[in-house]
């Protein structure tokens, strides 16, 4: 495929050809957010190597700077320096905190700022973020004594936060969401008494790993690590953080490499945290030819290189506890399902309806336009693969993961496609289009 930018908001995608080479995906988005945030509330200096220099982490950095944290320039390939202000050092900003398009930023900030007694904050973001539900964070925080006001009884930004001294206790999260869990863990750091957070299913655990590294008194227990207990009173201290490559970004190359005729790719330095490797388990279920090479550990996170070769894929069925471990990879798995002979089914994935877009609806709409055979359900998709996809006019509908998933679909289609909203990829993978152009043969 060749990629031709026809305007700032669209590109021409030409199908055909092979895919080979080595690629290093950007730093993990989830870890990048947390490294910035935990560094800002620690004492001393935190250095971050490999931080994702994309729009979402930039939103987190901007909010923290507005409250008094000193964060150095964020550029590709440069170590970022964060001078922490301590657990209670963040100050009232002079303006609304703009979280951009980042659900992680606004939800983690809610947990942190709700516990800043005597200070007041207003959090907002772009039009997409203002449509995303926030009560999943606000309601459990309210049980701890938080005061959060917003549209639709606090479910939609802008949100006004009046900082309080929060109470510890046993708090259940309404959904298996690392964002919700992390917000509660941040609130628990300065609560009155210990807090135990209980999830309905195990979500990604980057916050638990990193908070312990920074010095928090945090214990993980219960079935599959679903009970997390935080005892307040411990200071956090600056750390040297190395951010591995984002497996959610690697997923696009894994699927493309598994499907493009003759393809062989190596994706280097990918984070292999077991709460994030659901995509590898499903691809193995599909009999994709994937090897994990050079396994090692960096800053408490398992890392490795992934080699993928093209081969025939079998249909798959996913549901239940694996969904939180691959929730961001469902769009690219929907593309993969279109090229399997047989029926694939995704259920228990209603969480995708409240992402940057309604990803179930958007992927159904866009892939159907290419000729895919898809039934959309309340909580998932049924996809009958084996039909030839045709190049056509496509639209990311402002969603970064949709944009990159459709690029892979276009690579495998018959005929060219035009993608509107290609710039959305910059939210998590600023160099995606450059890497695609380089790897195409």
From Swiss-Prot:
Q: Name one Pfam family in it.
A: EPSP_synthase
The entry lists its GO molecular-function terms as: 3-phosphoshikimate 1-carboxyvinyltransferase activity
Mind telling me which InterPro entries this protein's record contains?
Answer: Enolpyruvate_Tfrase_dom (IPR001986), Enolpyruvate_Tfrase_sf (IPR036968), EPSP_synthase (IPR006264), EPSP_synthase_CS (IPR023193), RNA3'P_cycl/enolpyr_Trfase_a/b (IPR013792)
Q: Where in the cell is it found?
A: Cytoplasm
Q: Which UniProt keywords apply?
A: Amino-acid biosynthesis, Aromatic amino acid biosynthesis, Cytoplasm, Transferase
Catalytic activity annotation: 3-phosphoshikimate + phosphoenolpyruvate = 5-O-(1-carboxyvinyl)-3-phosphoshikimate + phosphate
Positions of phosphoenolpyruvate binding: 29, 103, 132, 179, 359, 401
GO cellular component, as recorded:
cytoplasm
Pathway(s) of this molecule: Metabolic intermediate biosynthesis; chorismate biosynthesis; chorismate from D-erythrose 4-phosphate and phosphoenolpyruvate: step 6/7
| EC identifiers of the protein | 2.5.1.19
User: What EC class does the entry list?
Assistant: transferase
Checking CDD domains in the record gives: EPSP_synthase (cd01556)
Q: Example GO biological process term? A: aromatic amino acid family biosynthetic process
Which positions are annotated as binding 3-phosphoshikimate?
29-30, 34, 177, 179, 328, 355
The positions flagged as active site in the entry are 328 (proton acceptor)
Q: Which HAMAP family match?
A: EPSP_synth (MF_00210)
Function (record text):
Catalyzes the transfer of the enolpyruvyl moiety of phosphoenolpyruvate (PEP) to the 5-hydroxyl of shikimate-3-phosphate (S3P) to produce enolpyruvyl shikimate-3-phosphate and inorganic phosphate.
Q: Subunit arrangement?
A: Monomer.
Q: Which family does it belong to?
A: Belongs to the EPSP synthase family.
- This protein's name: 3-phosphoshikimate 1-carboxyvinyltransferase
Organism (species): Prochlorococcus marinus (strain MIT 9313)
């Amino acid at each position: 495929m060749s990629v031709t930018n026809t305007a700032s908001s669209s590109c021409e995608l030409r199908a055909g050809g092979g895919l080979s080479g080595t690629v290093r995906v950007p730093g993990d988005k989830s870890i990048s957010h947390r490294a910035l945030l935990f560094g800002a509330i620690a004492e001393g200096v935190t250095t971050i190597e490999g931080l994702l220099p994309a729009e979402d982490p930039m939103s987190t950095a901007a909010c923290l700077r507005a409250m008094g944290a000193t964060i150095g320039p964020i550029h590709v390939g440069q170590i970022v320096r964060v001078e922490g202000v301590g657990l209670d050092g963040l100050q009232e900003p002079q303006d609304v905190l703009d979280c951009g398009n980042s659900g992680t930023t606004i939800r983690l900030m809610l947990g942190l700022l709700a516990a800043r007694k005597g200070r007041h904050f207003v959090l907002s973001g772009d039009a997409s973020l203002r449509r995303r539900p926030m009560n999943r964070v606000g309601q459990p925080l309210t049980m701890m004594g938080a005061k959060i006001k917003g549209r639709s009884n606090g479910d939609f930004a802008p949100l006004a936060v009046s900082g309080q001294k929060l109470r510890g206790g046993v708090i259940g999260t309404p959904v298996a969401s690392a964002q919700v869990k992390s917000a509660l863990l941040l609130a628990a750091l300065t609560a009155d008494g210990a807090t135990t957070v209980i999830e309905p299913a195990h979500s990604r655990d980057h916050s638990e790993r990193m908070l312990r590294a920074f010095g928090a008194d945090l214990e993980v227990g219960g079935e599959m690590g679903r009970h997390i207990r935080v005892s307040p009173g411990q200071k956090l201290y600056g750390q040297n953080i190395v951010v591995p490559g984002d497996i959610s970004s690697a997923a696009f190359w894994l699927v493309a490499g598994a499907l493009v005729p003759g393809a062989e790719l190596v994706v280097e330095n990918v984070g292999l945290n077991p709460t994030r490797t659901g995509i590898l388990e499903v691809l193995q279920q599909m009999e994709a030819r994937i090897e994990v090479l050079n396994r090692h550990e960096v800053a408490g996170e398992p890392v490795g290189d992934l080699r993928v070769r093209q081969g025939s894929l079998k249909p798959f069925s996913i549901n239940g506890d694996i969904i939180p471990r691959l929730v961001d990879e469902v769009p690219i798995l929907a593309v993969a399902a279109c090229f399997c002979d047989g029926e694939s089914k995704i259920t228990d994935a209603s969480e995708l309806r409240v992402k940057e877009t309604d990803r179930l609806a958007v992927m159904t709409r866009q892939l159907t336009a290419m000729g895919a055979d898809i039934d959309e359900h309340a909580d998932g998709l049924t996809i009958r693969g084996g039909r030839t996809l045709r190049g056509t006019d496509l639209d990311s509908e402002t969603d970064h993961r949709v944009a990159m998933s459709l690029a892979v679909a276009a690579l495998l289609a018959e005929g060219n496609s035009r993608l509107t909203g290609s710039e959305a990829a910059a939210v998590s993978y600023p160099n995606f289009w450059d890497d695609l152009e380089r790897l195409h043969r």
